[in-house]
Regions:
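Sec-dependent N-terminal signal peptides
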Residues: 2-11
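Charge-biased low-complexity segments
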Residues: 12-126
Length: 126
């Protein structure tokens, strides 16, 4: 029985070599496609201030915040809820913002693709 399980695991298709980078690329392509820039405007109108406030709060509450640049990628579902929210590089500031961002609801995205990919590059300047 154990050997069957091992064989099944070995023959299962693996994850892509770099799923994060693939998701970022898909999000960038989606943003550049028809309807992408309009959705970006709606999204930032809804969460721009909230994102800034969350980022400032994360920095203020961490003992030695690592302000290195990072990228956040997420899937927006039809109802605006978020899934698969990930960051790279996973600094303390990035993971703090990731945890806050994951609970937010964004405007309903275009119907296609579903789920709708987004990516945000963060660069914190003094």
């Amino acid at each position: 029985m154990t050997s069957l399980l091992v064989l099944a695991l070995l023959s299962a298709p693996g994850m892509p070599a770099d799923d994060f980078s693939t998701r970022v690329q898909q999000a960038k392509l989606t943003e550049g496609a028809k309807g992408g820039s309009e959705y970006q405007k709606q999204m930032w109108a809804a969460i721009g201030d909230r994102t800034t406030d969350a980022l400032k709060s994360c920095i203020a509450t961490l003992p030695k915040p690592d302000k290195s640049p990072f990228t956040l990628v997420a899937d927006v579902h039809a109802d605006g809820s978020l899934g698969r929210v990930e960051v790279r590089a996973p600094t303390d500031v990035a993971t703090c913002l990731q945890s806050r961002f994951a609970s937010w609801k964004l405007p309903a995205p275009p119907a296609s693709p579903a789920p709708y990919p987004i990516e945000v590059d963060f660069s914190i300047t003094p």
